[in-house]
Curated annotation (Swiss-Prot):
Catalysed reactions, semicolon-separated: UDP-N-acetyl-alpha-D-muramate + L-alanine + ATP = UDP-N-acetyl-alpha-D-muramoyl-L-alanine + ADP + phosphate + H(+)
GO biological process, alphabetically ordered: cell division; cell wall organization; peptidoglycan biosynthetic process; regulation of cell shape
Main location: cytoplasm
Residues the entry annotates as binding ATP: 115-121
Protein's gene: murC
Pathway: Cell wall biogenesis; peptidoglycan biosynthesis
Pfam families per record: Mur_ligase (PF01225), Mur_ligase_C (PF02875), Mur_ligase_M (PF08245)
Signal peptide as annotated in the record: none
Protein's recorded name: UDP-N-acetylmuramate--L-alanine ligase
Length: 458
């Protein structure tokens, strides 16, 4: 305890280049801790951490943990990882990333954003609002926030804004003072087993709020609404529903922005604008409006903060335009995210949409095959590529070809399966001047956009 409090502890992260691990490592480095980490390959993230003073190793080896006091792992780290085995042999504590995040949050008032979709954007907006309001928050986000140039920020204020990860149940380790839930969809059932267990997990997460805290819940989402009777702490709701405590009306989708009127019950708070695409981002912004209002931040300050929000990398990021073809990249990989992103693309650009989609994980493809089958209706052309395994083993019946067959069966007229290495070339053959090309998925499909732009520039 004295080592951690005196900041003399040597903390090692296995898989430090991961988006969830790197943010915590960066905050600890900025606090003055000795931080080391390992990853399989060098990346922009590991280079950034090394530049901040982190000791980064490539490859996993027992000698990486010989001089450390604690080892931090994510759920992606296998039990037989040599660093984990050596740490346990030496009786060095091995803890999940959420436990380390919780230790940082104990020093602050925690604002934790959870949900199946939209939590990275909402977390980023919330951190930006608190910064704009002069509260100088610490933030750990599951994506690179453009205004921070990173997925983490160390602040001197009393608040810490974090993205809460439900995928492995680890959000039940963190102590939020304010909890926001954007939505709850059946996802990560490899961990939760049943949708009801997932729902119960969110109830437990919200009930971790202290008696003086607050839960901010999206009443528009039926599963979120269903947890209201089980929540034992103070709740405010938000959404388009007339039953919402904070309500959005007159939503306008125009180009790269969404505008709407916000109300606190029957009191008008004003018209707000955020430079994000898609109706769903009106609700993400509304959650932040509710947060600001409940914290006593004037609506005018919130309006200015949302208007100046610069977004998050890989959340509808325009990668470039060549020969009249615009290339956009997005992280969406769940059917609900895919559907919302494609709808937003069509509404914002009003062009023909060519979608390059890479399924993420065999389990997700298998479990959500039926939902994926109807998620691509707003794509005029769909190029499907190989499943990004994310460490999983192949599952019979869960392939890109199986997914393409399901999408065609539900009526899509233009679906083609293309190997990842040939994706950019295949896209070049299909596009026309004026098209919007959307690379979509949580894997390395993000690189296909620059590859296509390079081909178009030749």
């Amino acid at each position: 305890m004295s080592l951690f409090r005196s900041r003399q502890a040597k903390i090692h992260f296995v898989g430090v280049g991961g988006i969830g691990m790197s943010g915590i490592a960066e905050v600890l480095l900025n606090l003055g801790y000795t931080v080391s980490g390992s990853d399989l390959r060098e990346s922009e993230t590991t280079r950034r951490l090394a530049g901040l003073g982190g000791h980064i190793s490539y490859g996993h080896a027992a000698e990486n943990v010989l001089q450390v006091d604690v080892v931090v792992i994510s759920s992606a780290v296998k039990r037989d990882n040599p660093e984990v085995l050596e740490a346990r042999r030496r009786k060095i504590p091995v803890i999940p990333r959420a436990e380390m995040l919780a230790e940082l949050m104990r020093l602050k008032y925690g604002v934790a954003i959870a949900g199946s979709h939209g939590k990275t954007t909402t977390t980023s907006m919330a951190a930006h609002l608190l910064a704009h309001a002069g509260l100088d928050p610490t933030a750990v986000v599951g994506g690179k926030v453009n205004a921070f140039g990173s997925n983490a920020k160390l602040g001197k204020g009393d608040y810490m804004v974090v993205e809460a990860d439900e995928s492995d149940g680890s959000f039940l380790r963190i102590p939020p003072t304010i909890a926001i839930v954007t939505n709850i969809d059946p996802e990560h059932l490899d961990h939760w087993k049943t949708p009801d267990a997932l729902r119960r997990g969110f109830v437990d997460f919200v009930n971790r709020v202290p008696f003086y805290g607050l839960a901010i819940l999206c009443i528009d989402h039926p599963t979120v609404q269903s947890i209201l009777p089980d929540v034992e702490k103070r709740v405010v709701t938000y959404g388009e529903s007339h039953q919402a405590d904070y309500r959005a009306e007159a939503i306008e989708l125009s180009g790269h922005a969404v505008r709407f009127d916000a109300f606190r019950r029957d009191e008008a708070l004003g018209r707000f604008e955020v430079a994000m695409v898609g109706r769903h981002n009106a609700l993400n912004a509304l959650a932040v409006i509710a947060l600001g209002d409940e914290m006593g931040i004037p609506p005018l300050v919130t309006r200015e903060a949302l208007r100046s929000f610069q977004g998050v990398q890989r959340r509808f990021t325009v990668r470039g335009e060549v020969a009249g073809v615009t290339v956009v990249d997005d992280y969406g990989h769940h059917p609900a995210e895919v559907k919302a992103t494609l709808q937003g693309a069509r509404e914002a650009f009003k062009r023909r949409v060519v979608c390059l989609f890479q399924p993420h994980r065999y389990t997700r493809t298998r479990d959500l095959m039926a939902e994926f089958a109807t998620a691509f209706n707003d794509a005029d052309v769909l190029l499907l590529t190989d499943i990004y395994a994310a460490g999983e083993e192949p599952i019979p019946g869960a392939t890109a070809a199986n997914l393409a067959e399901a999408i065609r069966a539900w009526g899509h007229r233009d679906v083609t399966v293309v190997p990842r290495a040939e994706l950019a070339r295949a896209a070049r053959e299909r596009i026309r001047p004026g098209d919007l090309v959307l690379t979509l998925g949580a894997g390395d499909v993000t690189a296909a956009g620059p590859e296509l732009l390079a081909l178009l520039e030749r």
